[in-house]
Curated annotation (Swiss-Prot):
Protein's recorded name: DNA polymerase IV
Family per similarity comment: Belongs to the DNA polymerase type-Y family.
GO biological process terms on file: DNA-templated DNA replication; error-prone translesion synthesis; SOS response
Protein source organism: Alkalilimnicola ehrlichii (strain ATCC BAA-1101 / DSM 17681 / MLHE-1)
Localization annotation: Cytoplasm
Predominant location category: cytoplasm
Subunit composition and interactions: Monomer.
Cofactor, free-text remark: Binds 2 magnesium ions per subunit.
Its job: Poorly processive, error-prone DNA polymerase involved in untargeted mutagenesis. Copies undamaged DNA at stalled replication forks, which arise in vivo from mismatched or misaligned primer ends. These misaligned primers can be extended by PolIV. Exhibits no 3'-5' exonuclease (proofreading) activity. May be involved in translesional synthesis, in conjunction with the beta clamp from PolIII.
Length: 355
């Protein structure tokens, strides 16, 4: 097994923690950052006080308000979050050039060749967390292991403000006890399919041969086969220019009603818009992805002036859906993607929303 030293750093309830830091009166109170609870927006982040009420990211804001009527709802300040994130990313690069940001609040670091702290990834992670708190007043959790898969899982085990290490010699035993839903790349639909096959843990997955996995999961088979053994050779890649932002969902039961399809796509538009806002991007092309019940897949696209808001994205979806066989053929998956990306400032984003 590879003896790389990988750290996954994940800020704790990042957006909500920034708001509690900047507004001391909110400390200890349930804080939700995201859309208007009286509208169709979604939760971008929830403080740990809010999470105790069952609130989580991507949840409709109206539902979060029902779960916790006393929660404080705030609009995101993405320009502030991006500034803090840039400060943290600069700190990471003091230790290694191999930094792969996943979003504003998390990143992988390959510190295999870092000489600091005697080359100990655990001590490096501890020092990074301490420096983040010293410089920003925010806490971060970190996971340390021999690959990205294990480091990311480890970072979630002692949240908030925690550090967890999975040594290479414990990797296989750790994955064996892991629910398959925690394995990288296993979404809800794949998890349900695995469970119907009697696969509920990493140990169950490991019992399947590569041929059995290929019959069930096609091109993803080798990936699952390796992860079930605690192996993940994906390198830490410094960020490359993003070409598109998208979200999709597979339905437990096929959809037949176009009106329901548009309703189900609204949260996807919200997610894409939130991602664009976080990155300071807008896009000229909106693409609809449709997978029918027989697994035939098509895409339809519309291009125009750059869009960033959820309302602008949703406005293009009816025409795209009308150009498909939705309503005549059952649909099992829908996806929304924005491409042709351009960088926009907060002022430019506000101007876009006026048109």
């Amino acid at each position: 097994m590879s003896q790389r030293k990988i750290i996954h750093v994940d800020m704790d309830a990042f957006y909500a923690s920034v708001e509690q830091r900047d507004r001391p009166g909110l400390r200890g109170r349930p804080v939700v950052v995201g859309g208007d609870p009286n509208g169709r927006g979604v939760v971008a982040a929830a403080s740990y006080e809010a999470r105790r009420h069952g609130i989580h990211s991507a949840m409709p804001a109206w539902r979060a308000a029902r779960l916790c009527p006393d929660a404080v709802f705030l609009r995101p300040r993405f320009d502030v979050y991006r500034s803090i994130s840039a400060q943290i990313q600069a700190l990471f690069r003091e230790y290694t050039p191999l930094v792969e940001p996943l979003s504003l609040d998390e990143a992988y670091l390959d510190v295999s060749d870092c000489p600091r702290r005697g080359g100990s990834a655990t001590l490096i992670a501890r020092e990074i967390r301490a420096r983040i708190h010293e410089q920003t007043g925010l806490t971060a959790s970190a996971g340390v292991s021999c690959n990205k898969f294990l480091a990311k899982i480890a970072s979630d085990l002692d949240k908030p403000d925690g550090l967890h290490v999975i040594p290479p010699e414990q990797a296989e035993a750790f994955v064996a006890a892991l629910p398959v839903g925690k394995i990288h790349g296993v979404g809800q639909a794949t998890r349900q399919r695995m469970e119907r096959m009697g696969v509920r843990t990493g140990a169950d997955l490991r019992r399947l041969t590569l041929l059995e996995l290929q019959r069930a999961f096609g091109s993803r088979a080798r990936f699952y086969y390796e992860l079930a053994r605690g192996r993940d050779e994906r390198p830490v890649r410094p960020r490359r220019e993003r070409k598109s932002v998208g979200a999709e969902t597979t339905f437990g039961e096929d959809l037949n009603n176009p009106a329901e399809m548009l309703e189900r796509m609204a949260p996807l538009a919200d997610k894409v818009a939130a991602s664009l806002h976080r990155r300071g991007l807008a896009g000229r092309t909106v693409t609809l992805k449709v997978k029918y019940h027989d697994f035939r897949q098509i895409t339809r696209s519309l291009s125009g002036r750059p869009v960033q808001s959820a309302d602008e994205i949703r406005a293009r979806l009816p025409a795209l859906l009308q150009d498909t066989e939705a309503g005549d053929r059952p649909v099992r998956l829908l996806g929304v993607t924005v491409s042709g990306l351009v960088t926009v400032t907060p002022d430019q984003a506000r101007q876009l929303a006026l048109f």
